[in-house]
């Protein structure tokens, strides 16, 4: 059975990006509901005792939706970090040299990467996610937009960064202003986590996805 992961930071430490109230609903209620639903759906089925990624890749319907949303939310919450308090909007953050070189090779510059990321995430219609992934088939970085619970790991693409654009992720703090939320998100990206995800993607490919998920949700 799966458990709701603990967040690795103080939910009061995100300034005007996200409030503790948002975390209480997003993590404490929405994310928790996906975990609870998944446990109820897989009990006494062929999915009981399987690891999270295996369930995602071999299921459909309600089981898939809830399993994928557990993973998607886990990853999103690791992609953000608290405010630095410097007021720079994230410009003072250092990015791993290998990751920066890969981003500049694929997108031209970090400025262009940011512009394309925010444009792509703004353009996701309705509820969904916007990802930076490592494509294991062509060994390139690319953007992927997914709707509802869909996740790129079903296409053998390794997530490196994701932003949640379901309205419950930002409505308490930003109402319907998704672009404003995305600007704040970019200033709170946990680049150390993204760099580590990229490093493991290069070393282990899709195996890195299972390693990450199993660290949070060991099979019991």
From Swiss-Prot:
Keywords: Iron, Metal-binding, Oxidoreductase
Job description of the protein: Destroys superoxide anion radicals which are normally produced within the cells and which are toxic to biological systems.
EC nos: 1.15.1.1
Similarity comment: Belongs to the iron/manganese superoxide dismutase family.
Oxidoreductase found in the keyword field: yes
Entry cofactors: Fe cation
Source organism: Campylobacter jejuni subsp. jejuni serotype O:2 (strain ATCC 700819 / NCTC 11168)
Classification via Gene3D superfamilies: Fe,Mn superoxide dismutase (SOD) domain, Iron/manganese superoxide dismutase, C-terminal domain
Binding, Fe cation: 26, 73, 164, 168
Name under which the protein is recorded: Superoxide dismutase [Fe]
Record text on cofactor binding: Binds 1 Fe cation per subunit.
Subunit organization: Homodimer.
Molecular function GO terms recorded: metal ion binding; superoxide dismutase activity
Top-level lineage group: Bacteria
Catalysed reaction, written as an equation: 2 superoxide + 2 H(+) = H2O2 + O2
InterPro entries to which the protein is assigned, alphabetical: Mn/Fe_SOD, Mn/Fe_SOD_BS, Mn/Fe_SOD_C, Mn/Fe_SOD_N, Mn/Fe_SOD_N_sf, SOD_C_sf
């Amino acid at each position: 059975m799966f458990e709701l992961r603990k967040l690795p930071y103080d939910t009061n430490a995100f300034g005007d990006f996200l409030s503790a109230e948002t975390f209480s609903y997003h993590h404490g209620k929405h994310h928790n509901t996906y975990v609870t639903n998944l446990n109820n759906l897989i009990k006494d089925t062929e999915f009981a005792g399987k690891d999270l990624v295996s369930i995602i890749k071999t299921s459909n319907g309600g089981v898939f939706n809830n399993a994928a949303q557990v993973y998607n939310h886990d990853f999103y919450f690791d992609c953000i970090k608290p405010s630095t308090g410097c007021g720079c909007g994230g410009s003072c953050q250092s990015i791993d040299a290998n990751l920066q070189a890969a981003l500049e090779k694929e997108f031209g510059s970090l400025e262009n990467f940011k512009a394309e990321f925010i444009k792509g995430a703004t353009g996701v219609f309705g509820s969904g996610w916007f990802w930076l992934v490592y494509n294991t088939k062509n060994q390139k970085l690319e953007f992927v937009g997914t709707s509802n619970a869909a996740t790129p790991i079903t296409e053998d693409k390794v997530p490196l960064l994701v932003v949640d654009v379901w309205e419950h992720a930002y409505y308490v703090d930003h109402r319907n202003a998704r672009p404003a939320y995305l600007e704040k998100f970019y200033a709170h990206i946990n680049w150390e986590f993204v760099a580590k995800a990229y490093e493991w993607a290069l070393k282990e490919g899709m195996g890195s996805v299972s390693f990450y998920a199993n660290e949070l949700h060991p099979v019991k």
